[in-house]
Amino acid sequence: MTATIAVHEFISADGVFESPSWTFEFGFDPKMGETLAAITGNASTILLGRRTHEMFAPAWRDRTAEDDPGAPFFNETEKLVVGANEPAEEWANTTRLGAYDADAIRRLKQERDGVIYVSGSGQLVRGLIRDGLVDEVHLFVYPISLGEGDRFWAEGEQNKLVLQAHDVYDNGVVHLSYGLA
């Protein structure tokens, strides 16, 4: 029994993934939803950093499948939150793991099957990548350069990637699926 960790991010062409409200002007191609459904389809757990949890909880907890086809996944799936502090937002099926601990995440992977899905959570994702815990990185690259903001890749760290798949959508977004070499 070993789970895989799949990270999904919306990023700009220059690597910014902070506060992705800038994605709204491009719309959401229905084929992007199909890709996300494929990524989350085998996920039994959502792993989030505390700040991302605090952004996602109020955005998702009251949504229904009629509002967004992704709502049942986000609301019904077990959520584990990594952070030194208790999340300020309540959300069903959420458990706090405590501060980041690579060994605890390794045990989590060994104890589970399927996919552990991660979105946003920059500090957490950088730690997971640095500690060799990420199996897949799904980047939805938007055709815009923002020039400033929190970047996905940690400054000064090199990561070799292996392209697994790619998709191009009518709104100009490109999905790049990578494994870490």
Regions found by a protein language model. Give the residues of each.
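Enzymes that bind and transform nitrogen-containing heteroaromatic metabolites
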Residues: M1-A181
